[in-house]
Every structure is written in structure tokens, then in C-alpha cells.
Amino acid sequence: MGKNVVVLGSQWGDEGKGKIVDLLTEKASAVARFQGGHNAGHTLVVDGKTTILHLIPSGILREGVTCFIGNGVVLAPDALLKEMKNLEDNNVPVRERLRISPNCPLIMPYHVALDQAREAKRGSGKIGTTGRGIGPAYEDKVARRAIKLADLFRDDLEEKLRNLIEYHNFQLTQYYKVEAIDFDETLKLCQEWKEAIRGMVTDVTEDLNQLRLAGKNLMFEGAQGTLLDIDHGTYPFVTSSSVTAGGVSTGTGIGPLYLDYVLGITKAYTTRVGSGPFPTELFDDVGAHLAKVGHEFGATTGRARRCGWFDAEALRRAVVLNSMSGICLTKLDVLDGLEELLIGVGYNLPETECAGAHDAEFYESVTPKYETLQGWSESTVGITNYDELPENAKKYIKRIEVLIGCPIDIISTGPDREETIVLRDPYDA
């Protein structure tokens, strides 16, 4: 029988998931996205060529791999078609290999307008959204009024759309004081999307389960990271979907008992984009060094990422939340040359704080407890054999394993798919 592997972020996103999905799909027949939208930014480097994907699964660069977008994803058809064209212009066949669930809620122009209007009104209290309509689209889904991909093919689309635009335009014009969304233009867009996407719509749940029954290896690709999960993240500075392994089942229709291995992608230090608490954040030369050497700029927004020491306590919780089988430690090479490395091993918690909340106020109130390890002067760039790593790098890796209670199975030593140490392959585990 085949194996079903989940690959997801264990921090605040930007951990390097795209590269690892691309690497592991050598043994996979299909890759499925199960949550999020085009707010994701997965960077892949193959033979020195960089590709950034926002919506299409990272397995698209592997010949013969079928890519699925599950029902848990909020779909922006215009962004999808643009991404498809970019890939096809680079001789990557997409249309015949991409399959999309008809149950995906659509991101409409009014969602984008609402997202941007809300952030502008928050002023200094911004959550730090990408402004791409993700949150408002999920709101419509939960409120049971979303227009889903299937609705584009139904006779009552015009009536549904008219009612929704009337509803959202009231907020846009009366509360946010911005321009209304035009009904005719939006309806025309829907008609164009219908024709462009028609051939890719399929029952993703059925297709994935048929592949499973046929003994094929499947991969489920997460977006963002565990600490941005709508339920378990630093609320309200979170995304609007279920980012954890639990989201795989609800977002694709694959039952939880069919998931064989959960791989948590983790940077060798910690980063965060936008607003929100960050206990181990650095504001000194070391933080600037990590940002410069690690090229820490968001693939989706281009925003500079905040950098800090490795937070083992936050990762330990992510391991538990996702029942992680193993960790992939990325960007180890960024730490080359640092004399000392600090690891956050726990938090000092004020007596007034609500223990166990793990929301934004909780993380804002804590101060990290640190443990200091010696760094290494040798370069780890491109190393593919664990035994060739500097001794202090090995000690750093082993200490993290002890602190989080989970093995580090893969180590990334550079951006290219080949610059990787695989200690245990998830498909062979």
C-alpha cells in the first residue's frame, strides 16, 4: 500500500515547505492543498531556477504528479489563471494535471475590497493580512452564503451574486466609505472563470480516495504555519483556516486514520511576517544578520520578515497539536558563522495571565527562557551527508530533538532541492 504524508509549517509560516514538498514528490503520485488561498507563497529552486507558487500545489514541477486543490481552499480564479499562465509560459504543463474541488468557496472582488478596507480602518492595530480577501471569503463560507466553484455552473448564480453584492456593498459604502462593487462586471468575471476552469473541476475527495485504494503515495501540502492556525494560533493575529494536520481531513475528505506521517517544516531560527507577538524576536545585529543571510522577505507580500532565536517551546506545542512524526529543519546554513546560538526553552509567565490561552495576549505577556549553545564557523551550505556537518551543528540539532520530543528527519542546507540531508524519508518510515 502507498503512504499518505502531510507536510505543514510548524511556526509562523515561511518555513520552506515548497522546497520540501517538491523534493518529496519524487515518490508521490499526487499532491493536494487543503486550506488557505493565494496568501501562501511557496518558493522552489530547481537547478538554480526559482519558481514561486501561491495557489497551485508545489508538486506541479514534478512530471507526472497530479495536483489537487481541495474544498478547504478559498479559490481566487483570477490568481489561479495568472499562476497557470506563468507556469505554462515556462513549459510546465498545468491544465491536464490540475484538479479542483467544486466545493471551493470563491474569493470575489468584494472580499478583496472588504479585506483592504478593514485593514485601513484598523490603523495602528492592523492584523497584517495580505489584503487578498482570504478572511472575508472564509467568513462567507462559515455564514453559509459563499459562492462556491460549483455555483458558476448553476442557473441561480445571478440571483445569488446579486444578493451578495447588495449585502457587501452596504458595508463597503455605508461603513467603510469606499466604492461599491459593480454587479455586471463581477457577473462577467464569473462567466469568464467558468469557461477557463471548466475542464479542471472534479470530485477531489473521490479521486484522492481512489488513488489511495490503488496503493499510490499521496502528499498533503499545508500553507502558512501552526502558530497562525485560526484555533490554535496567536489569535487574532492568525489566518482564517485550519492550518494543522486536522485540516487535511476537513479540507480534502481524506479520513484522519488514512494519514500515515506528518512532517513539520521548521526553520533553524524563527521568523514572522507582519503584526503579532513574537517572544524570541531579535532587534540587534544578529537579527539583521539572519534577515540578510536568510533573504527574509515574504514570497507573497515582499514584506521583510522579523527574525529571532529558535523557539523550542512553541515548536513543542506544534508537535503535539499536529501529532508530528518528524521534523524537517530548514535554513541551517543561515546560522553558519555565529559564535553563540540561543534556544528559547520555555517562558516566564506573569501570574495575571490566563495559563493555556496561547493567544496573542498570552504570547505578548511572556518572556523567553534561553539556553546558550556554541555556534560553528564552518560552512554547512550544500552538505548532503549528516556526518559532514560541524560537531556543534550536530549538537544544536540533537538538543532541539530533545526539547521538542520529536526526531529531525530532514535537514535543509540550501535553497535547491538537492541541498538536503535526508535521515529518514517519510515514504519509507
UniProtKB/Swiss-Prot annotation:
SUPFAM superfamilies: P-loop containing nucleoside triphosphate hydrolases. IMP binds at D14, E15, G16, K17, N39, A40, G41, H42, T130, R144, Q224, T239, R303. It catalyses: IMP + L-aspartate + GTP = N(6)-(1,2-dicarboxyethyl)-AMP + GDP + phosphate + 2 H(+). The active site is at D14 (proton acceptor), H42 (proton donor). One of its GO terms (cellular component) is cytoplasm. The keyword Lyase does not apply. Pathway: Purine metabolism; AMP biosynthesis via de novo pathway; AMP from IMP: step 1/2. Mg(2+) binds at D14, G41. GO terms for molecular function: adenylosuccinate synthase activity; GTP binding; magnesium ion binding. SMART domains: Adenylsucc_synt (SM00788). It holds the Pfam family Adenylsucc_synt. GO terms for biological process: 'de novo' AMP biosynthetic process; IMP metabolic process. InterPro entries: Adenylosuccin_syn_GTP-bd, Adenylosuccin_syn_Lys_AS, Adenylosuccinate_synth_dom1, Adenylosuccinate_synth_dom2, Adenylosuccinate_synth_dom3, Adenylosuccinate_synthetase, P-loop_NTPase. Disulfide bonds: none annotated. Substrate binds at A299, T300, T301, G302, R303, A304, R305. Its cofactor is Mg(2+). GTP binds at residues 13-19, 41-43, 305, 331-333, 412-414. It is found in: Cytoplasm. Its EC number is 6.3.4.4. Its main location: cytoplasm. Keywords: Cytoplasm, GTP-binding, Ligase, Magnesium, Metal-binding, Nucleotide-binding, Purine biosynthesis. Belongs to the adenylosuccinate synthetase family. This is Adenylosuccinate synthetase. The lineage of its organism: Bacteria, Pseudomonadati, Pseudomonadota, Gammaproteobacteria, Moraxellales.
